[in-house]
Amino acid sequence: MAVLGKPKGHNRYRDPRTFEMTPALLRVRAPFFARNMIGLALATSIPLGVYLYTVDMLSKDEFSDIPIPPIADDELAKLKKEYEDKKNSS
């Protein structure tokens, strides 16, 4: 009994030597190109908008209203020494 269909190893949508798309595949995909590009634009614009909004809000943030606690010079020297020791040991 003969099996109908394409020959084994044959793909009519890809060139078997270069694996490039054939004109048949390009014709099949053509009606979906515009909708796919609109979907891609929507899918990328939402996260991009959230990112840009976040960067904009963070750049406007001011820390001038937060008081910096006073620190004595000897405490500052002690903290710097601890920081340097930790940095050198790592």
From Swiss-Prot:
Chain ranges on the Mitochondrial matrix side, renumbered to this chain: 1-31
Membrane protein topology class: Single-pass membrane protein
Mitochondrial intermembrane side: 55-90
A Gene Ontology BP annotation from the UniProt entry: mitochondrial cytochrome c oxidase assembly
Primary location recorded for the protein, binned into one broad class: mitochondrion
TM stretches of this protein: 32-54
Entry's Gene Ontology cellular component terms: mitochondrial inner membrane
Keyword tags: Membrane, Mitochondrion, Mitochondrion inner membrane, Transmembrane, Transmembrane helix
Location in the cell: Mitochondrion inner membrane
Function: Required for assembly of cytochrome c oxidase (complex IV).
Record note on quaternary structure: Component of 250-400 kDa complexes called cytochrome oxidase assembly intermediates or COA complexes.
UniProt-listed PANTHER family: CYTOCHROME C OXIDASE ASSEMBLY FACTOR 3 HOMOLOG, MITOCHONDRIAL (PTHR15642:SF3), CYTOCHROME C OXIDASE ASSEMBLY FACTOR 3, MITOCHONDRIAL (PTHR15642)
Family: Belongs to the COA3 family.
Protein name: Cytochrome c oxidase assembly factor 3, mitochondrial
Species name: Debaryomyces hansenii (strain ATCC 36239 / CBS 767 / BCRC 21394 / JCM 1990 / NBRC 0083 / IGC 2968)
